[in-house]
């Protein structure tokens, strides 16, 4: 694999993330009947560039009591993992075509928990630590349902490769037979990426701004980039799993356009939800998962396991 392939994946991701921050501020602005950023460049289009310059030219301060190595490693690890998770995504062709792409993505997203934990612990601040513990509890809790939902969808798909989902959904989106799974998946992705209404890690009133409270300038920007890269990545995964775009090898551009539009709509839904809903209480968040989602997803997983076995003897319908 050549360096150019990696760069042609990473640079567009970072650009998309930069402009997603602008889109979010604009969308939230218009939803609150104001303009949003509109000073830097035409219609505020150069705002992300100005932000990047400002953040990366500031001095990266760190608390005297912090653990230096971990404090610096955490944001680097967060961004590295966020970018690594894009490797097996078929858009329509993945960077590396893995047999167990889904498993790889789950493993990477589990590793991301460590960056949160380290940043909270290494900051040596009580607020950062509480925020980190909340974030870790939330992330690993919702990963359980994400994994089970993924398994159910892949049982319908019949293969662990993500590219196979494109073939599976040639005639019908998987959201139609699996809509309860899709709804739970979407809510779980919101919780997994620490977005409103599940942004308890950064409850301003009680925790200042969560696990990254002690970070400034560059390292803070890395956390920010990682968070938004994860948001786009989750929406891309939702598109692949439930809204499969039609892919013809003769016109791959059509797939890309189709795929991008769906991902953008889902990302806008994320922002819309942020503008509309108040934050959950922590016990409600955990009740929703362990008492509602987990039993439901387990039941649906059993259903999806038994479905191919039940229908195995039926002659093909097409």
Swiss-Prot record:
A biological process from GO: mitochondrial electron transport, NADH to ubiquinone
Domain of life where this protein originates: Eukaryota
Keyword Cytoplasm: no
Enzyme class: translocase
PROSITE patterns (UniProt xref): COMPLEX1_ND1_1, COMPLEX1_ND1_2
Membrane topology annotation: Multi-pass membrane protein
Alphabetically ordered keywords of this record: Electron transport, Membrane, Mitochondrion, Mitochondrion inner membrane, NAD, Respiratory chain, Translocase, Transmembrane, Transmembrane helix, Transport, Ubiquinone
Catalysis: reaction(s): a ubiquinone + NADH + 5 H(+)(in) = a ubiquinol + NAD(+) + 4 H(+)(out)
GO molecular function: NADH dehydrogenase (ubiquinone) activity
Annotated localization: Mitochondrion inner membrane
Transmembrane segments: 2-22, 69-89, 100-120, 146-166, 171-191, 223-243, 253-273, 294-314
Cellular compartments per GO CC: mitochondrial inner membrane; respiratory chain complex I
Enzyme Commission number(s) of this protein: 7.1.1.2
Subunit structure: Core subunit of respiratory chain NADH dehydrogenase (Complex I) which is composed of 45 different subunits.
Protein purpose: Core subunit of the mitochondrial membrane respiratory chain NADH dehydrogenase (Complex I) which catalyzes electron transfer from NADH through the respiratory chain, using ubiquinone as an electron acceptor. Essential for the catalytic activity and assembly of complex I.
Family: Belongs to the complex I subunit 1 family.
Protein name according to UniProt: NADH-ubiquinone oxidoreductase chain 1
Organism: Felis catus
Lineage, opening ranks: Eukaryota, Metazoa, Chordata, Craniata, Vertebrata
């Amino acid at each position: 694999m050549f360096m150019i392939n990696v760069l042609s994946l990473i640079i567009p991701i970072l650009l998309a993330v930069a402009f997603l921050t602008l889109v979010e501020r604009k969308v939230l602005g218009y939803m609150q009947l104001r303009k949003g950023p509109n000073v830097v460049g035409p219609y505020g289009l150069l705002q992300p560039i100005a932000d990047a310059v400002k953040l990366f030219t500031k001095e990266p301060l760190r608390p005297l009591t912090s653990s230096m190595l971990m404090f610096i490693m955490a944001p680097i690890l967060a961004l590295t993992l966020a970018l690594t998770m894009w490797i097996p995504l078929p858009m329509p062709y993945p960077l590396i075509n893995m047999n167990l792409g889904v498993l790889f993505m789950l493993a990477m997203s589990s590793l991301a928990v460590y960056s949160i934990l380290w940043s909270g612990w290494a900051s040596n601040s009580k607020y950062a630590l509480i925020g980190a513990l909340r974030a870790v509890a939330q992330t690993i809790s919702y990963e359980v349902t994400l994994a089970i939902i993924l398994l159910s969808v892949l049982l319908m798909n019949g293969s662990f490769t993500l590219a196979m989902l494109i073939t599976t959904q040639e005639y019908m989106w998987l959201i139609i037979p699996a809509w309860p799974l899709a709804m739970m998946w979407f809510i779980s992705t919101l919780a997994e990426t620490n977005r409103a209404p599940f942004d308890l890690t950064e409850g301003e009133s009680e925790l200042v701004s969560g696990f990254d409270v002690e970070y400034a300038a560059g390292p803070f920007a890395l956390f920010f980039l990682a968070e938004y890269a994860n948001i786009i990545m989750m929406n891309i995964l939702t598109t692949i799993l439930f809204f499969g775009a039609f892919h013809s090898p003769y016109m791959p551009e059509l797939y890309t356009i189709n795929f991008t539009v769906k991902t953008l709509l889902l990302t806008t839904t994320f922002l819309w939800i942020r503008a509309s809903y108040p934050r959950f209480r922590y016990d409600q968040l955990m009740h929703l998962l362990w008492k509602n989602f987990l039993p439901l997803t387990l039941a649906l997983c059993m259903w999806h396991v038994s479905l191919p076995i039940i229908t195995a003897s039926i002659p093909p319908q097409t």
